[in-house]
């Protein structure tokens, strides 16, 4: 693994851990129920919609709360796409003289704060190609952590439920709550990596797997349908309703914390340590 990838993985782990625990604890202080707080913390700290759905599958949360949190993610990400490049241009050139370092820190900052992968790609391209490369790497590293976070959530809940029932928690309970589709994703990734390594798939000049047109079409259609369904289940007045107000403020406060703490982590890793190590 190259130095750039190593720093990206380190940042991903730090950001996910710190932001998840802050978002969860702050949500609980705002009197958000435990399951919704876990869904919110997972979606905000890892990768938005996918992480929210995964956490909801593990905790068995309310579908209406899940839909609300997903809606928040998708609504907030739109201004974030433009806000983050503006902040990067306004702040980073006053800290670093090297434009390349500015791009790296900006990409790391954007990759760790914007909740959706597509939003990260679009926002970081506004800054530049180097920023885009770093942002995408860090976001990919965060996405991988979905399974890790899901496992620890399941372990925590099994312990809590085991205590209440007077039974010792078992791996069987953890396995019951663990999202099995993550294993399928990992297995599919390994299979395709092996097949591509043996030259069984066509790759472009950068070594990226050439995606078949039909597969890309179905992927686009089903993702579009999924987001349309989320929108159909969302009413804008519910976003600011009294019932959801605590959840809204918890999300916004955690997102603000995410922006600040990710900036500091990216600053240290990509602005100080990486240039020192060359």
Map each language-model feature to its residues.
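Structural signature of hydrophobic alpha-helical transmembrane segments
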Residues: 6-17, 41-44, 105-110, 139-145, ...
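Short, small-residue-biased leader/transition segments that mark boundaries at the very start
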Residues: 1-3
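Oxyanion-binding "anion nests"
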Residues: 128-171, 178
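Transmembrane alpha-helical segments of multi-pass membrane transport proteins and ion-pumping complexes
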Residues: 16-28, 48-53, 77-90, 117-121, ...
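Junctions where cytoplasmic loops transition into the N-terminal start of transmembrane alpha-helices
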Residues: 56, 61-79, 138-139, 177, ...
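Transmembrane helical segments that form the transport core of multi-pass membrane transport proteins
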Residues: 157-263
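Juxtamembrane boundary at the C-terminal end of a transmembrane helix
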Residues: 263-278
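Alpha-helical membrane segments and immediately flanking helix-loop junctions
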Residues: 34-80, 102-127, 218
